[in-house]
């Protein structure tokens, strides 16, 4: 009972996190990884159920933390028995400083009650390194995003009536604003996010994610300016970036943050069938880095 109480508090707390999803999924579940040491790590899965009960989607670990990581998940779900299993593989992006071979991938088996209001998913997991060694064990406990939204609505109704809470705080606590903050990759000043791709040429779209107010940015590749003084507007601007064989560190610098104090530029990167969306939230003179890591296409042995 205690563990469930702490998990509920934790679920509410992880909604102070940034988000936006452009792709729709059959299921979107939020909660935590509970390690055997009783340590909690925020966790999210979103997936579609395909033919033959096959599931495919993404996981997001340590949301808005220093090790935030997005990975593919693949597995199976039987809605008649409620049994579900999936494994993480192939990192899409990470904020972690660990090397790819040092990542601990989740292998999960448990129950998923998709017909219930909570959309409760829970069960055991084993964390596995690339070399198949075990790196962690514990449980995963998740509930549906819509269930949490209902809970937040109830809390918001109470807060809205409290006169001592200012309007800005009330606005940020609106359910639609809370939930809008949950799944996007947001980089702040001095932060670096590593994105893993298989291509040598990367298409990128750039636009103003907030209010159009005259934001101007410059992008440097390995400290050399490649796109200078771009005026960011609500209209998407498309560019193609040629990647070097080894290092591809792209620095986004806010030259002018416009009328508002903070520049919120959204960048969408395309790599074959993959897409990555990153929001750079930077004040004038601040910079953040997107590190593009080129991967080799795996060959069959």
Regions found by a protein language model. Name each.
Residues 1-30:
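Bacterial Sec-dependent N-terminal signal peptides
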Residues 20-44, 56-59, 75, 120-127:
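Tryptophan-anchored aromatic micro-motifs
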Residues 23-27, 123, 198-200, 244-248, ...:
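A glycine-anchored, Pro-Gly-centered beta-turn/N-cap motif
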Residues 61-116:
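Contiguous, well-ordered beta-strand patches that form the walls/edges
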Residues 129-132, 255-264, 272-276:
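Short acidic/polar inter-strand loop motif in beta-rich domains
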Residues 131-199, 292-297:
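Pro/Ala/Gly-rich low-complexity, hydrophilic intrinsically disordered segments
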Residues 204, 237, 245-256:
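Short, well-structured beta-strand segments within conserved domains
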Residues 214-224, 261-272:
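Short, surface-exposed beta-strand/strand-loop-strand elements in extracellular ectodomains
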């Amino acid at each position: 009972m205690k563990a469930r109480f702490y998990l509920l508090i934790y679920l509410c707390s992880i909604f102070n996190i940034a988000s936006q999803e452009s792709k729709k999924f059959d299921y979107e579940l939020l909660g935590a990884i509970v390690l055997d040491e009783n340590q909690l790590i925020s966790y999210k899965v979103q997936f579609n159920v395909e033919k033959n009960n096959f599931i495919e989607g993404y996981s997001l670990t340590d949301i808005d933390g220093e090790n935030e990581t997005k990975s593919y998940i693949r597995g199976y779900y039987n809605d008649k028995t409620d049994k579900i299993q999936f494994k993480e593989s192939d990192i899409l992006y990470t904020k972690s400083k660990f090397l790819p071979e040092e990542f601990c991938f989740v292998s999960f088996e448990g129950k998923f009650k998709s017909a219930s209001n909570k959309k409760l998913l829970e069960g055991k997991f084993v964390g596995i390194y690339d070399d198949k060694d075990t790196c962690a064990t514990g449980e995963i406990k998740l509930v549906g995003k819509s269930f949490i939204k209902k809970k937040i609505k109830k809390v918001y109704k109470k807060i809205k009536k409290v006169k001592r809470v200012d309007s800005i705080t009330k606005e940020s606590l609106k359910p639609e604003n809370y939930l809008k903050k949950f799944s996007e990759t947001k980089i702040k000043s001095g932060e670096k996010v590593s994105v893993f791709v298989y291509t040598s040429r990367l298409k990128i779209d750039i636009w103003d994610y907030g209010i159009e107010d005259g934001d101007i940015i410059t992008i440097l590749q390995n400290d050399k300016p490649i796109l200078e003084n771009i005026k960011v507007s609500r209209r998407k601007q498309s560019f193609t970036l040629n990647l070097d064989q080894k290092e591809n560190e792209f620095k986004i610098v806010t030259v002018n943050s416009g009328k508002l104090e903070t520049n919120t530029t959204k960048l969408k990167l395309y790599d074959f069938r993959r897409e990555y969306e990153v929001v750079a939230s930077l004040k004038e003179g601040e910079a953040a880095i997107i590190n593009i890591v080129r991967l080799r296409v795996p060959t069959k042995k």
